[in-house]
């Protein structure tokens, strides 16, 4: 296990991730596969640790954003099928084939170049991305779709393993655009001479709300980590999700301020009475952003406001009473009856819950818990 020497850390509850995947496994129609989405270091939770847990809980495949993320999982011993959801270079097809990594394809000219560069015999699997209304990646034209299918068919090492699309509004209460995209996908599937083995369109929101329209695989991302795809549909979810990510620190200094004394850069906070101020070693360089000034944390089971501007490596909080150095501070998570959720942080920042754990950076070690015990400690600082 890695060591760390700053009293700020993330705790990842792998039991929660296991339960979220296992609950989805039970909820989905029989025969529906789960592709666990572990891009962006598993949304800040730890890619290999989450991948292994998800596979154990019933996922059969993994998805990442780009090839480097897939290769990193292979180096960490993850052997399950992996799909790269984003764009890849045609020059890297051989590398993907060598490591049994499936690539997303959506352009015939890309595929022509890849076929001219790849002279190997090892099969390379592709998933065709269709743009049904997201406007990001994906083929939209029938003739282009048929060209891609024909190119794959003419190049024997190439295998069309799957076809998919992505919903733009499955996390909204209004389902009009979702229904439009779904109908569009059904229509576009008929452009192919035959359907490949895997057909997938459902993200977390669609998998949990419209499991009858999931084809034979779903991509389970945000809700694997215990987070609702949006606050609006949280009451509509079929079962309770278990949040896996919590963030903690400790008081490293406690001081008493007199009325009129100031705190932090810009002297934007002024003590109104005698106040106890605590310093904790986390700042915007760790992803605890300056906009979280005036937010609160938990200390001694009570809420304590963040006062003054958040610094690069530290921030200050107003304590309810004098507390000893070393007292635990919870920035995300539970203390006693009080809870600060990722959704609470996202609401204060005016963003979505996805962004919060992704933003907590590499300087903050991750402690992984499984079966209520520490399984691993991972500190990325100093790792080459």
From Swiss-Prot:
The modification N6-(pyridoxal phosphate)lysine is found at residue 39. GO terms for cellular component: cytosol. The keyword Cell division does not apply. Keywords: Isomerase, Pyridoxal phosphate. PROSITE patterns: ALANINE_RACEMASE. One of its GO terms (molecular function) is pyridoxal phosphate binding. Its cofactor is pyridoxal 5'-phosphate. The active site is at residues 39, 265. SUPFAM superfamilies: Alanine racemase C-terminal domain-like (SSF50621), PLP-binding barrel (SSF51419). Its EC number is 5.1.1.1. Transmembrane segments: none annotated. Coiled coil: none annotated. One of its GO terms (biological process) is D-alanine biosynthetic process. CDD domains: PLPDE_III_AR. The keyword Isomerase applies. It catalyses: L-alanine = D-alanine. It holds the Pfam family Ala_racemase_C. Pathway: Amino-acid biosynthesis; D-alanine biosynthesis; D-alanine from L-alanine: step 1/1. It is an enzyme of class 5 (isomerase). PANTHER family: ALANINE RACEMASE, ALANINE RACEMASE, CATABOLIC-RELATED. Belongs to the alanine racemase family. This is Alanine racemase. It comes from Geobacillus kaustophilus (strain HTA426). The gene is alr.
């Amino acid at each position: 296990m890695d060591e760390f020497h700053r009293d700020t850390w993330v705790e990842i509850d792998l039991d929660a991730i296991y339960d979220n995947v296992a609950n989805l496994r039970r909820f989905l129609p029989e025969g529906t596969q789960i592709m666990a989405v572990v891009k962006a270091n598993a949304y800040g939770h730890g890619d290999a640790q989450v991948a292994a847990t998800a596979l154990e809980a019933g996922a059969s495949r993994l998805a990442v954003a780009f090839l480097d993320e897939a290769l990193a999982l292979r180096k960490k011993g993850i052997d399950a099928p992996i799909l790269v959801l984003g764009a890849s270079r045609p020059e890297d097809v051989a590398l993907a084939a060598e490591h049994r990594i499936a690539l997303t394809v959506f352009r015939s000219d890309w595929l022509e170049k890849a076929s001219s560069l790849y002279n190997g015999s090892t099969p390379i699997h592709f998933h065709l991305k269709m743009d049904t209304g997201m406007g990001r990646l994906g083929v939209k034209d029938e003739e282009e779709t048929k060209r891609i299918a024909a190119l794959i068919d003419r190049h024997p090492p190439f295998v069309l393993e799957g076809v998919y699309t992505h919903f733009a509004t499955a996390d909204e209460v209004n389902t009009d655009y979702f229904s439009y995209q779904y109908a569009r996908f059904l229509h576009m599937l008929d452009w192919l001479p035959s359907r490949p083995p895997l057909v997938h369109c459902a993200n977390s929101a669609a998998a949990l709300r419209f499991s009858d329209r999931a084809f034979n695989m779903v991509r389970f991302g945000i809700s694997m980590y215990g987070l609702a795809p949006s606050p609006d549909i949280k009451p509509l979810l079929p079962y309770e999700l278990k949040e896996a990510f919590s963030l903690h620190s400790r008081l490293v200094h406690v001081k008493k301020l007199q009325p009129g004394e100031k705190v932090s850069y810009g002297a934007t906070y002024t003590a109104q009475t005698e106040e106890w101020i605590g310093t904790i070693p986390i700042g915007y360089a760790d992803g605890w952003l300056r906009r979280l000034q005036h937010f609160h944390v938990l200390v001694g089971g009570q809420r304590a406001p963040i006062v003054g501007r958040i610094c690069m490596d530290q921030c200050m909080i107003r304590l309810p009473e004098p507390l000893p150095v070393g007292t635990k501070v919870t920035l995300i998570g539970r203390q006693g009856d009080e809870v600060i959720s990722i959704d609470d942080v996202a609401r204060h920042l005016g963003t979505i819950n996805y962004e919060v754990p992704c933003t907590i950076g590499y300087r903050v070690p991750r402690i992984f818990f499984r079966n209520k015990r520490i399984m691993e400690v991972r500190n990325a600082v100093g790792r080459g």
